[in-house]
């Protein structure tokens, strides 16, 4: 697959994202909606963008790595959630489940889930948004509880994997910024059903 970049776009490397969400039609990713600020040079105004370019594979992969966090935060995968996540290799239970970190994200427990977006608030919190496809084929929309990425005071009730969640969100932010800058997946062009000669 060939991914493309547009030229002549503003530099989004310094954009401060507040929301990123896949736009989907009939179960297919068709674009990305984002809310962000570009900083002082642009008047520090909140901007929005909705593009109908297909998201690039690196962005989809980065969002896919958030799936275990969505599952754990929403308590959708109880048989794994209390045992830990792939980076907790000191846990014998996890060692028996996971060969490598990459294998962890493709575990069958996560196959029916999709992270479609996330949003930050002005107090340093984040909310993950996603879906679970039920055995009936229907879709259950999931919104994870808000988590403070850098709590000022620890209460013991924080999500246990905040460091990894923050790292993965930064990777997603980078990929969304590249998308805003023009990087996208291959465009799907519908072929004509009839040749021009056949229409005559």
Per-segment meaning from a language model:
Residues 1-123:
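OB-fold ssDNA-binding interfaces and closely related basic DNA-contact patches used
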Residues 104-195:
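Conserved binding-pocket/active-site segment within a compact domain
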Residues 197-200:
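Polybasic, proline/glycine-rich intrinsically disordered low-complexity segments
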């Amino acid at each position: 697959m060939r991914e493309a970049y547009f030229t002549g776009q503003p530099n989004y490397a310094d954009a401060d994202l507040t929301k990123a969400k896949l736009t989907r039609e009939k179960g297919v990713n068709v674009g990305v909606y984002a809310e962000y600020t570009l900083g002082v040079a642009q008047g520090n105004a909140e901007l929005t963008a909705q593009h109908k370019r297909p998201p690039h594979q690196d962005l989809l992969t980065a969002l896919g790595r958030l799936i275990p966090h969505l599952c754990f935060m929403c308590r959708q995968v109880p048989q794994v959630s209390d045992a830990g996540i792939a980076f907790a290799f000191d846990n014998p239970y996890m060692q028996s489940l996971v060969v490598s970190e990459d294998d962890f994200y493709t575990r069958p427990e996560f196959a029916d889930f999709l992270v479609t977006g996330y949003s930050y608030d002005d107090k340093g919190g984040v909310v993950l948004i996603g879906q679970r496809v039920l055995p009936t084929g229907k879709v259950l929309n999931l919104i994870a509880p808000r988590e403070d990425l850098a709590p000022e005071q620890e209460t013991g009730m924080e999500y246990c994997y905040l460091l990894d969640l923050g790292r993965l969100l930064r990777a997603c932010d980078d990929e969304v910024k590249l998308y805003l800058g023009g990087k996208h997946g291959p465009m799907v062009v519908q072929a004509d059903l009839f040749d021009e000669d056949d229409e005559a």
